[in-house]
Amino acid sequence: MSAIAPGMILIAYLCGSISSAILVCRLCGLPDPRTSGSGNPGATNVLRIGGKGAAVAVLIFDVLKGMLPVWGAYELGVSPFWLGLIAIAACLGHIWPVFFGFKGGKGVATAFGAIAPIGWDLTGVMAGTWLLTVLLSGYSSLGAIVSALIAPFYVWWFKPQFTFPVSMLSCLILLRHHDNIQRLWRRQETKIWTKFKRKREKDPE
């Protein structure tokens, strides 16, 4: 089945290149996420500039475009090595989308979707780690960073044959968050709900 893997890698990259954040913002008449808010075309920035509905739509689409190519390849019996490359291709498409001038997001939701076919137990633990970190800290970026750091250990515990490709995905996510890591270190990172607190202060009930 590895003979079909190169084609699946291309399909995964093209799926990843469909930037849902940009498309949803266009459809909803919202500002371009590449030039508004944090400048990152992802669900968190769409939440800041467009609200929950648009952000949820972006999040679901970004997860699916990572999940479906990997899931399809998994069902076809593609080996863990090639599955890892397919997952990375989907994330590379999200980060450097061919359809949008190679300027994309950070790949967190797409990476999560790509890991999901490995097992629902792993998916639940990963989602719980991200959510707990965000709830305790208020930083979406910190949730992504902590999840990326811990993901290889989770995978080693649940499905050790996927440890290497997931480790490569984690490195990619961490590299894309180098600016966030610097801002967190300097205590300059914006918390995910800061916008909503400011809005309530401006528009008291």
UniProtKB/Swiss-Prot annotation:
One of its GO terms (molecular function) is acyl-phosphate glycerol-3-phosphate acyltransferase activity. Residues 25-52, 102-111, 159-205 are cytoplasmic. Residues 1-3, 74-80, 133-137 are periplasmic. InterPro entries: G3P_acylTferase_PlsY. The chain crosses the membrane at residues 4-24, 53-73, 81-101, 112-132, 138-158. Its EC number is 2.3.1.15, 2.3.1.n5. One of its GO terms (biological process) is phospholipid biosynthetic process. Probably interacts with PlsX. HAMAP family: PlsY (MF_01043). NCBIfam families: glycerol-3-phosphate 1-O-acyltransferase PlsY. Belongs to the PlsY family. This is Probable glycerol-3-phosphate acyltransferase. It comes from Escherichia coli (strain K12). The gene is plsY.
